[in-house]
Amino acid sequence: MGKITFYEDRGFQGRHYECSSDHSNLQPYFSRCNSIRVDSGCWMLYEQPNFQGPQYFLRRGDYPDYQQWMGLNDSIRSCRLIPHTGSHRLRIYEREDYRGQMVEITEDCSSLHDRFHFSEIHSFNVLEGWWVLYEMTNYRGRQYLLRPGDYRRYHDWGATNARVGSLRRAVDFY
């Protein structure tokens, strides 16, 4: 079970809302979000309702302002609690429809280019666990949540291009 608290003001001040499950529309509970406290679980936050728009992955911890979660503004309109899974395994392919060179990954990777010489990934096969894909190396840039399943082309995970810099398992290390 997870627990996250959203605060309208920086530094955990102002009106707040506590949440322990997925919410497709947080607008009725707060008008802006400038700080967050994650007491348990891993969460994906979305700037738009219905799990749309830019995404932000948060683990247990305190985020006193939106820059701490790499946010571009104070808009959080939906959230998803990421289920805990024991093992993680995915396959990346350099071309669409699982073509080209394939690599299987079971651990976080801060630079796909340095480790595998990939700067673009066109398809994924998420076999176990939930993953967070980052557009840039060292877990920076746009983020995308990958749940178990098939991603035949980059549009399937919501991206506008095939640029992938790093991957991280969606796990709470505490």
From Swiss-Prot:
InterPro entries: Beta/Gamma-Crystallin, Beta/gamma_crystallin, G_crystallin-like. The keyword Repeat applies. The keyword Repeat applies. Residues 2-40, 41-83, 88-128, 129-171 form the Beta/gamma crystallin 'Greek key' domain. Crystallins are the dominant structural components of the vertebrate eye lens. GO terms for biological process: lens development in camera-type eye; visual perception. Disulfide bonds: none annotated. This is Gamma-crystallin F. It comes from Bos taurus (Bovine). Keywords: Eye lens protein, Repeat. Has a two-domain beta-structure, folded into four very similar Greek key motifs. GO terms for molecular function: structural constituent of eye lens. Residues 84-87 are annotated as: Connecting peptide. Belongs to the beta/gamma-crystallin family. It comes from the Eukaryota.
